[in-house]
Amino acid sequence: MAVGWSIAALLLWRTSVPAGLRLPQVDARAYFSAAELERASDFETFLRIEWPLATVVLFTCLVFMALRGPRLARSTGLGPIGTGIVLAVVTVTLAAAASLPFALAGQWWDRRHGLSRSSYGDALLELWLTLLVEVAFTLLVISVVMALARRFARTWWIGAGVFFVALGVALSLVLPALSSLELEPLRRPRVAADARVLARITGAEDIPVSVEEVHEETTRANAYAFGLGPTRRVVLWDTLLDGRFSRGEIRVVLAHEFGHHTREHLAKGLSWFALFTFPGMLVLALLTRRRGGLANAEVVPYALLVLSAIQLASLPVENVLSRRYEAESDWVALEATRDPAAARGLFRRFSTTGLGDPDPPTWSYVLLETHPTLMQRIAMANAWGRAEGGGR
């Protein structure tokens, strides 16, 4: 089993970025003014304080519920699965309530820096809707996992792993189809023409490009690829098309997102999820077994604590994989557009418009960054240009 896991991981790890590619050293001061670097650093510093504090508060809530679980379980009288669901919902709700001050602080910080146009009421509504989704998801997951644990005391984790992987695949197919109902077609003739050309170059002719209207909520610019099979799509935020980004920079974005699809990054992400889900479920089973197993409702809050700890511990690995695929999409974009100058301009503008730190601290990079740093991305553009004989 370990050999099969290793072979699968090795195959998924491979990318089209040349194995011997060496990124040149780049100095952020060559691309950003001192004022731009200071502003981005100041903005990110607040977020780097907020995240550890929010994480500590979250785990405090989870530990509290894990300790109180047995007493609360005895007071419900709803049966094992019903009691487990109640304890899980209470835990999720408590965690959401504890996160509220941090969410509002983040909204205040974004508004202070001109990045958010949403009101505090909008932020509260979004948190409420998120909580409803989390509660519904919790109802489903606890019902299934506890039923498996009660039926298969020692091997339930295998069935739970299958359930989570199947759920991940289903959501990857269904959610994009539902989300596409709120998207707009790409009505910019020049951008649409560029998209068709780049889709042909990258082999993504069958993937549509849509626009998501977010200008009333944020000034940030972004784009993303999502979906599997018939639901695959590239989505541009309308803020990317508001005149702040050049035609060449938008072409780089399009090629990058097409690269995610043509290099099967979303499917590979699900494959990694499967590879780590089963060991994660085994660890959960072993740790909860010491407290009587997940067949017992009183263990549910403790199980949520363990799952959260596993997720926190896996963040560095998840980010390494994400950054690797993002780098490959950058390489695809450079190969398709053959315009390293536009790529450098895009990465620079991402910082000046979104206040992203071009060169974050190492701990932040390891724990929080899903993309290569902006300086690493600029360095890759330089490396591509050098490999092509100077580039542009």
Predicted regions and their residues:
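Polar-ligand-bearing catalytic/cofactor-coordination segments
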Residues: 2, 9-66, 73-294, 308, ...
